[in-house]
Structure formats: C-alpha cells, structure tokens
Amino acid sequence: MYGNYPHFIKFPAGFGNSPVHASSTSVSPSSSLSVGSTVDGHHNYLEAPTNASRALPSPMNTIGSPVNALGSPYRVIASSIGSHPVALSSSAPGMNFVTHSPQPNVLNNVSSSEDIKPLPGLPGIGNMNYPSTSPGSLAKHICAICGDRSSGKHYGVYSCEGCKGFFKRTIRKDLIYTCRDNKDCLIDKRQRNRCQYCRYQKCLAMGMKREAVQEERQGSRERSENEAESTSGGSEDMPVERILEAELAVEPKTEAYSDVNTESSTNDPVTNICHAADKQLFTLVEWAKRIPHFSDLTLEDQVILLRAGWNELLIASFSHRSVSVQDGILLATGLHVHRSSAHSAGVGSIFDRVLTELVSKMKDMQMDKSELGCLRAIVLFNPDAKGLSSPSEVESLREKVYATLEAYTKQKYPEQPGRFAKLLLRLPALRSIGLKCLEHLFFFKLIGDTPIDTFLMEMLETPLQVT
C-alpha cells in the first residue's frame, strides 16, 4: 500500500533494522532552503536560495520554521550569523546529504606551523593592512580569517570570537583535520564552518601563534590555583548562564492552562501530544543555536545531532514543565493531559513511565531550569550519533557540560553531594522513554488514525539510519 513512495524509514536503535515504507511527497535532492535570522524572538523564516534547482514541493514553502533545517526534506541549518546554505541529498550514508565537511584524519596532521604551506586562494596574506589600534577605531577592525567583525587582537591577529575560539580549541585539543576538496576552500563569514582544515591553515597563515594559546593555558592554570571557585561554576567555555538563557528564551508562555476536554482541543490525547511536539519543533533549532559552541560545529554535524536527539529533548522539556500539575503532563500548547485520558487512548504504559521516571523524580529533587538545560545539552552533544565528522569535538563539548553541571550543583546545592549523580541517572530513563515514544509515533503514523502535523511527520519519515 506504500509502494508508490520513495523514502524508507529505518527505526532507531532498539527497533530492528527492517525498513518500513512511509508516505512522503517526493523531494528533489538538489532542493535547498536557508534559514533566516530570528527577529524579536520570532521563529526563523525559510526562503529558497537563488541557486536552487526548483522549489520544494511541500507546504513548507509557505510556512516559516527553523525545523525545516533538520535533514531531508529539512535542507539546512544556518547559524545565527548567516552560514552559507549546504545542499543536501539522499545519497550519503546515515544523514542523507552530500557535503564537503572535514573529518579528523591522521594522514593530514596540521598540528604545527612548520607543516603549513601557503594556500592558493588566500587573499592578501602577504600585504594585510590592519586599521589603527586606537580605542575609537577598534570596532572598525575585521577578522583576518573570515572577514567578520573583529573583537580585538587574539593570538597575534585581529580576529572575531568565532575564529579565536576555533583556533584555541584546535590547539588545546590537538585536533587534526582533513580537506575533502583541494585544500583551497574559501574561508569567509558565511562559509567558515564548511572546512575546518582550511580554516585552521588560514589561521596559521595569517599569523595566529600556537604558543600564545599554550602560554594562555599555562597562565590560566596558575591563576586558578590562587583564585576562589567561580560562583557560577563550570567551564568558561560552557557557562551555565548561557545554558539557562537558552532555556528561558524558548520556554512557551503558558499563562492559562486548559484541559484536554475543552473546545479548543480534541478529545484524543495522542493527537494533542503530537500537535504540541510539532509546535515545539519550531523552537528546537533556535534553542540549540543558543547553546555555547553548537553553531561552531559543521552544519552537517548540527543536523545530525538535532535529528538524533529531538525526541528526548522535547520529552525532557514537557516533563519538567509538568512538575506543577497533578497526575498529568502540561504541553507547550497549554493543554493538560490527564493520566486517565492517556490510558483510555492506549498509551497509558508509556505515559505512566513519563510520570514516574521523569516528572516525579524532577519534582522530588526540585530540578531547576539550569539543571534541565545542562541535561538537555548533554543529550544534544551525543558523540555516538551516526555520521558525525568530528565525534571527538562533540564528546569534548559534552564533557564541558558535565563539568559545568557538576560545578553548578556543588555551588548551588552544597548540602546535596549526590545531586550531580542523581541528575545524570535521569538520562538512561529519558533515552529509554524516548525510544518507546518513537515506536508509538511510527505506529500511529503508519496506521493513519492519528493526525500528525507537517513537521513531525517529516521528522518521522527521515530518521537516522541504523548501522
């Protein structure tokens, strides 16, 4: 009955490897979309680039949402600074796109400046003229690496915060990159995340000094021995304040809660839950881009991480939102779904697990927003997601979140030495529940009895491949 549709679904780990036909509008592999910037807190809007071979034959052409960036048919995730759109296709393994992103490779060691040779196509390397260094003209400096606005002189070169952080992480972690093209990739403000190999070589070619990073690290280590622990806690590269800001920025304003039996909703709790999930997918990309260093990853890796963890990220959010309600969950739409309604709809088992293993535990320990944000960031930075070009970098970011969360709990709750461990124990339950919820969603989609909205449907139709 599904033979006329081109896409296949392969279930995530735990569901077997049998492909299941799914209904889907055929999408041209060459179609692409770009995500506009967020204005006044509203969601990003999509617009077709001029070089797209044809318009995407989908209602999403007229509906703006950053979620359309989540893979085929979600074409691109563009960072808030306007990263260049990347065309995706269904031919690449795991993530269904074709890219030229770098991957770590021991054959291309660029860990020392002696290995660097002049790159073709690097403009003005030998005759770069910097503006004056007076305080009044500092804002006029541009980044020598990508042309973005410079924040000052870093490691010997005027550069932006993005290139400064990229160079520092590369040196401190001794990262090794490769170029999938001819080692002459254009590095500018829009495409600086496309090739880490060429970006790093340009940093060195423009005069950034490895030893400056190493000296800075040694100096910070010595200072830390003489300074008291920061009141905010955690890593300076992963401040808990930024994680909290991300949570607060996307939290729906549910001032007036309503019941599932009101006229504004259907009587089917599954339909209400699916509608709420679809609505929250609008804000998921916006949230992720506010998490420190997520936008520094390649666009391909951003897509992979969001598609690998979207269900767990949404479940964690509505579970924490539900600690204030009795025997039910509170959806982003403001609807309160009762336990009895879930049982009558045939999803009582998984609903009870959400209440007992997540909502109840969060309520008992009074988990705050900062802790929730850290747990969600840990879920986001999943180094085991299939197809990542730089899993070691993702793992390093996850470890930074671990350190931030541990420092935060020690500083905020010194009388609870086991709080950090209790928080981490919610992650296996969240993972298990997330997989079971996916199983239910696939079932409801296939039997066709439950209306599933556009964006959630497309997320279900292009899951990660299991290898």
Swiss-Prot record:
Instruction: Supply the SMART domains for this chain.
Output: HOLI, ZnF_C4
UniProt-listed Pfam families = Hormone_recep (PF00104), Nuc_recep-AF1 (PF11825), zf-C4 (PF00105)
**Boundaries of each NR LBD domain copy?**
235-463
Q: Where is this region: Modulating?
A: 1-142
Subcellular location per UniProt equals: Nucleus
Membrane keyword on record: no
Write down any Gene Ontology CC term: RNA polymerase II transcription regulator complex
Keyword annotations for this protein, in alphabetical order, are:
DNA-binding, Metal-binding, Nucleus, Receptor, Transcription, Transcription regulation, Zinc, Zinc-finger
Q: Which GO terms describe its molecular function?
A: cis-regulatory region sequence-specific DNA binding; nuclear receptor activity; nuclear steroid receptor activity; retinoic acid-responsive element binding; zinc ion binding
Q: Where is the signal peptide?
A: none
Anything noted about its domains? Answer: Composed of three domains: a modulating N-terminal domain, a DNA-binding domain and a C-terminal ligand-binding domain.
What family is this? Belongs to the nuclear hormone receptor family. NR2 subfamily.
Q: What is this protein called?
A: Retinoic acid receptor RXR-gamma
Native species: Gallus gallus (Chicken)
